[in-house]
Amino acid sequence: MIIKREMRQDKRAAPKAPINENISAREVRLIGADGEQIGIVSIDEALRIAEEAKLDLVEISADAVPPVCRVMDYGKSIFEKKKQVAAAKKNQKQIQVKEIKFRPGTEEGDYQVKLRNLVRFLSDGDRAKVSLRFRGREMAHQELGMELLKRVEGDLLEYGSVEQHPKMEGRQLIMVIAPKKKK
């Protein structure tokens, strides 16, 4: 299916504020380029002031009576807003859920390696999902799996707290541990 370019709308495009001649009000409350209140003036007077300053007249609040307009460089303000949004997005930390898989018969050496990885995940600020998979006849001894997860919980007390207590999902016993908040 072919969609014409004019028909497509960019969902990311923010609704643009009316500027200059696109402002429909007859009178506006005007704010100058340096932020000072000029007062209520006619739209023609506001456009003249903006033109003298070689800037744009931008409608800030259409809901107010009369609408609030400001004299500013519209292109520059859009650029600054985009820059702020990009900086805020960059500073967000994505919390991930890391998973470590155990078996009911996990030996001590393997247990220590997996525990070390869990400590690293929690120290990095990620949540950890501990899953214990049962195969075949191991399902008859689910208490061994519960003991193992209780041991993991006890060993990780200083690094995190249990967010989701152990529960069975099919043939797996699953527990989620959240990192402790850093002070």
From Swiss-Prot:
Entries under Gene3D superfamilies matching the protein: Translation initiation factor 3 (IF-3), C-terminal domain, Translation initiation factor 3 (IF-3), N-terminal domain
Cellular component annotations (GO), alphabetically ordered: cytosol; membrane
SUPFAM superfamilies named among the record's database cross-references: Translation initiation factor IF3, C-terminal domain, Translation initiation factor IF3, N-terminal domain
Biological role stated in the UniProt entry: IF-3 binds to the 30S ribosomal subunit and shifts the equilibrium between 70S ribosomes and their 50S and 30S subunits in favor of the free subunits, thus enhancing the availability of 30S subunits on which protein synthesis initiation begins.
Lineage: Bacteria, Pseudomonadati, Pseudomonadota, Gammaproteobacteria, Pseudomonadales
S-S bridge residues: none
Superkingdom, natural source: Bacteria
Cross-referenced PROSITE patterns: IF3
Main location: cytoplasm
GO biological process per UniProt: ribosome disassembly
The protein, known as: Translation initiation factor IF-3
Entries under HAMAP family matching the protein: IF_3 (MF_00080)
Assembly and binders: Monomer.
Keywords for the protein's UniProt record, in alphabetical order: Cytoplasm, Initiation factor, Protein biosynthesis
InterPro entries: T_IF-3_C_sf, T_IF-3_N_sf, Translation_initiation_fac3_CS, Translation_initiation_fac_3, Translation_initiation_fac_3_C, Translation_initiation_fac_3_N
Presence of keyword Protein biosynthesis: yes
